[in-house]
Amino acid sequence: MMKSIRFLASALALCLVDAYLVTPPGTPAPGAASACSAWVQASYGLTCDIIHRFYGMTAAEFEEWVSKCPAAQLYPLNYICTDSAKNPSVSQLGDGCTLISGLYYCVQVNYITQSPTWTPPTTTTRSTSSSAGNGVTTPTPTQTGMVSSCNRFYLVVSGDSCYDIAAAQGISLDNFYTWNPAVGSSCGGLWPDYYVCVGVISDGTTTTTTTTTTPTTTSTTTTTAGNGVTTPTPIQTGMVTNCNKFYQVVSGDGCYDIAAAAGIALNDFYTWNPAVGNTCAGLWPDYYVCVGIIGSSGTTTTKTTTTTTSGNGVATPTPTQSGMVSNCKKFYLVVSGDGCYDIAAAAGIALSDFYAWNPAVGDTCAGLWPNYYVCVGI
């Protein structure tokens, strides 16, 4: 009986040493860094290269986080470092990098500065004086390049968008991007659980917040083109001056959905509203967009079936996006909410093949259009 108790205690002790900054939802890959704060589960079609590009890390970083013993200054008391902890399937990256399906791999590490006495991580956020010496304490973590004159901060949570944060804080979106350059001009670099700047010190003395947002009430003005049509505001820059039909964007809208509901072609929507970009990344809620112009009767999309031009005898359904391979034999109709990885996995093909056969979707899946057919087999 005593031997069983000692064995159980030893087993529990071994489990305790595998502590992580953020506990993975399932079984972690052997040798994952104890300072790991984000995880991804290996599944069919997921490759090391996809992980590198999606999470913005180098192959060397990924190898270190998932297969090497953590540095001594990280968590010296909660991890036993041995060579046997390395995971051969990842440590030998190169062209032969493979992942073990079902295991969780580390994709983010939060480092802690070495100190004489180690203190376990807590749920509270560390604060340090800003490097500018302006007397304002800056909470951490923050992304690189944040303005040194910041005096108001916001902790990003999953699901936030740059527009929503700026609107809630009463600042302009342009100022938000200027103060937080790491998030990028399309908000693609906004990281949950990081602090962003939402207010700055004016003239180095007074604490103020610049407010240039549009009031929630909507006013109307006459278009500068003098076409007699009143244009509601706010609108984004560059909208065509001969617009005679408008739509106010709501949170959750997509460019394709707006165009389809208005009975116009997506290309026309992008042309009439250039500020939204050709991937819809610049679509702003609560702003009006153009969905009809003078002299246009709209475009009705009809679905027909035609034979492929390559003469392979396979009927190709329409519509399809440009550039799809001509020797495709198997098709899938995209529905709203689909992702390239999910489509490829369901069809049993590699994600790289899906991108190669459907170049219009791009290598980040930003160009995937609902209600269009894509190739999932050749």
Swiss-Prot record:
Signal sequence coordinates: 1-19
Region (Disordered): 118-139, 208-230
Domain LysM: 152-198, 245-291, 330-376
Residue ranges that the Swiss-Prot or TrEMBL entry lists as coiled coil: none
PROSITE patterns from the UniProt entry: LYSM
Main location: secreted
Subcellular location per the Swiss-Prot or TrEMBL entry: Secreted; Secreted, Cell wall; Secreted, Extracellular space, Extracellular matrix
Record note on domains: The LysM (lysin motif) domains are small globular domains involved in binding chitin in eukaryotes. LcpA contains 3 LysM domains.
Protein name: Secreted LysM effector ldpA
